[in-house]
Amino acid sequence: MMGKIMGTLILILMFMNLGAPPSNSVVIFENESVNPFENLYKAICEVESSGNPLAIGDRHLKEWSYGICQVRRSRLTDYYRRTGIRYSTSDMFDPAKAKEVFMYYCMDYSPSQFMEISRSWNGGYDYMKKNSTIQYWNKIQKQL
């Protein structure tokens, strides 16, 4: 019964030309940007901090890491040198700022190079020399 009523209503609207905009109309949809690194970002945050934006890691090392994706001071120094945007380690407790830094470095690679991005995020620019970054990549793959 309901189906017949809906069908009749649709036919009436079509005949009254209320069912669609005139042909010279334009419909604009909000632009949703596509970020090929979003899943990689989420996986790295899970491995690095279990998603905790207030995490402090690597306390056993000379240089600690901070925030949801565990950013080190040396990374922030390089980010400032490249972009002119100066963040402190405490800024990395803000997930939006940490994500901004992470995504900047992702753009140095093509979207298909998740392994290289992940390993360099973990091991720095000489990640290829560090076997530990292979183990890190294996953890990331499980989260993707």
Briefly describe each language-model feature range.
Residues 22-144:
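Catalytic glycan-binding domains that act on GlcNAc-containing polysaccharides
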